[in-house]
Amino acid sequence: MSVVKSFAWRWLAVRGSLRSSLMKSLIFPLLLLSLSEMQAQFPTIPMVLQPGKVLGKAEYVVDYSYWSKMAPQSKDSVEDIIRIELGQTLVKSYSYKLWQADSALTHAPDKSARMRVPDEGMSPFWYYRDLTNGRTQVWYRTPLSGPILSYIDTPTFSWTITGSKKTISGYETQLATCVFRGRSYEAWFTPSIPISAGPSLFGGLPGLILELRSVDGTHHFTLDALQKRAGDIVEWKVRLVKTVSRPQFRNYYERVHKHPIQTLRSNGQRIYPQDDQGNFISEAEAVDWQIPYNPIELE
C-alpha cells in the first residue's frame, strides 16, 4: 500500500544542513491529511531579498488573484496573488504574498529567529521577461530553503483571437485561445493597454491579459487591481543560485514531486518524515511518499 494511503501526513521535521543561514532547525506543517485531501506542497520559505540593478521602468502595477489546484482531480484550490510590474519593454512577475513574507524577513532585526511558515499555495517562481524579444529569465525556489534554480526561456504563443468581448474592471476585453505546453487556455486581453504581457510568463497578444484560465479549470488568473504607477523594475539579488537549462529544471521539478525525499537529500537536506502521531516513519515508507504534481507547464 502506498505510504500516502496509510498515513495522515501532518509534519515534516527538517534538520541539519539546509544551505541557509536562517535557521538550524525547522519544523514545517505539511497539511496533507488523506489521499483525498492531497493539496499540500512543501512550503515556500521566505528569504532575504536585496535590491540589485535597475532593469527598466514600470508604467503599471497589476495584481491578479491566482487559483490553482495542486492535483488535477482535486475539488479545492489554493489562492495566491501574482503581481506584475509592467513597462513597455520589460515585465517582472512574482508572488505578492511571498514578497510580503520576504520583506518581513528582510527587515526583521533578528533574521535567525524562528519564523512563521507562510500559507500554502504561494508560487515559488518569479520572472523577468524582455518584451522586445520574449527572452524570459525564470527563477525557482527549491523547497525548504534549498538552492534557487535559474534558467532562460523564450516561450511562444499561437493565439487565435475570437470575436467574443466582455468588460473587466471598466476595460473592454477580447477573447483569445491557444494551446501552450500541454494545456488549452482562454485569455481576455485589452487593446486599451497595448503591451503584450500577462501574469507569469504569459503574453503574445496585442494588449495586456486581464484574465487567463486553463480550460481544464486547474489554473485561473483574474484581475484584482490595476494601477498606472511609474517606478523602477529592480532585479533581486539572491544567494545560492544554480544556473540550469529548462530541461534540467523540468527534470528536477518532476523529481522533487515524485521522489521528494531522495531529491531533497541530494541537495544536502536531511529530511525526517513523521506520521500524524509524531512517530518517525521507516525509510522504505518515506521514499514511497509523493507530492501532488500539477505544473502549469505540462511540456
Q: Which stretches of residues belong to each language-model region?
A:
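Extended soluble regions of mature proteins
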Residues: 42-299
